[in-house]
Amino acid sequence: MREILHIQGGQCGNQIGSKFWEVVCDEHGIDPTGRYVGTSDLQLERVNVYYNEASCGRFVPRAVLMDLEPGTMDSVRTGPYGQIFRPDNFVFGQSGAGNNWAKGHYTEGAELIDSVLDVVRKEAENCDCLQGFQVCHSLGGGTGSGMGTLLISKIREEYPDRMMLTFSVFPSPKVSDTVVEPYNATLSVHQLVENADECMVLDNEALYDICFRTLKLTTPSFGDLNHLISATMSGVTCCLRFPGQLNSDLRKLAVNLIPFPRLHFFMVGFAPLTSRGSQQYRALTVPELTQQMWDAKNMMCAADPRHGRYLTASAMFRGKMSTKEVDEQMINVQNKNSSYFVEWIPNNVKSSVCDIPPRGLSMASTFIGNSTSIQEMFRRVSEQFTAMFRRKAFLHWYTGEGMDEMEFTEAESNMNDLVSEYQQYQDATADEEAEYEDEEAIQDE
């Protein structure tokens, strides 16, 4: 079956990742020791997308866990599902990357990368027909960003025809963890533009807002944020794991969402978001789900889709519902908000339906949109980057690990190019495209 190999790196990646496994284990009825305790055959039908069945009938996640310090791994190991992972798949160093991208990418990370690749290879060989990789990491730190992007480029070399999907936590505008985040994030985006196929963009601030505003949590913890992320991650892949009427896989997703190869950074959303207490009292309808799913407040990254236009979007519904109703709602959204969709890609919203809803809900939906407004986020990081780089602040930490200033300049201009590409397609109209083709034709003559 079409397996997905999951890789988590750094503190953030390991925390999101372990939460994700809790959700997926729950959906497939697998207990913390890896035994199946579920009730429905559907849970087992495609369990091998994410799990390898060991000889004793236990299910072991196809997961590789890496970090440059042992701390987070220890807490994953002692966490609720810590015993389910294959012990050899924990790969960690002792030194830490100290929020330094260069340490993760060039020095400390480079020393550890071969051991990680060995584990990845071993897991990939266990697969019947590997579909691709999903990587969880943050871009603000050292390990997830530096070593994460190093691993992505190495995997790209070795498995060029497999999909590479990332769940990347971007530094958020107001909540800053370290002062060098803009450097780390810009250097990472430079890599992701070239080596990843699809990036799901998340950021803590947007997640805080959702917890605070929609879920009415007064003091949201990282656990709450990660819970939101894992709901989305599980939604993105539910089509692969459960039977449905309209299925999609990582590659179909990419084909439908990426009109130009570099523009593969997606906003994600999830519905229904209700506070934990009030969940059981209301029946959901497809129109309500659709309404909430397209709501700007529901997006998990700090960019406002109303400031740009959707190039493409994909909606994944879960639960028993009529496909006809889903299609009608989707057409309805596009007709009502036609100015927010580029007119030169007709029918640019794809929907899929999977029959099994997440635990505790009768239906749910996951939204993935390729919107030009995501440039706001790159712009923001880029401005912070430039402010520091102009003064060469903190650069010695990077050059000391053998990096060259040139690399910073390249990363900066790559990010700025990305922003202007988004802008170009935001402004493009169907007529302009035609004019442009005429010009080309004239030049060719």
UniProtKB/Swiss-Prot annotation:
A GO molecular function for this record? structural constituent of cytoskeleton
The coding gene here is TUBB5
Alphabetized, the UniProt keywords read: Cytoplasm, Cytoskeleton, GTP-binding, Magnesium, Metal-binding, Microtubule, Nucleotide-binding
From start to end residue, where is composition biased (Acidic residues)? 429-445
Which residues are GTP-binding?
A: 11, 69, 138, 142-144, 204, 226
What range does the record give for the signal peptide? none
Quote the record's binding site residues for Mg(2+).
69
Name recorded for this polypeptide: Tubulin beta-5 chain
Does the keyword section mention Ion transport?
Answer: no
Its assembly, as annotated, is: Dimer of alpha and beta chains. A typical microtubule is a hollow water-filled tube with an outer diameter of 25 nm and an inner diameter of 15 nM. Alpha-beta heterodimers associate head-to-tail to form protofilaments running lengthwise along the microtubule wall with the beta-tubulin subunit facing the microtubule plus end conferring a structural polarity. Microtubules usually have 13 protofilaments but different protofilament numbers can be found in some organisms and specialized cells.
Q: Where in the cell is it found?
A: Cytoplasm, Cytoskeleton
Q: Which organism is it from?
A: Zea mays
Cofactor requirements of the protein: Mg(2+)
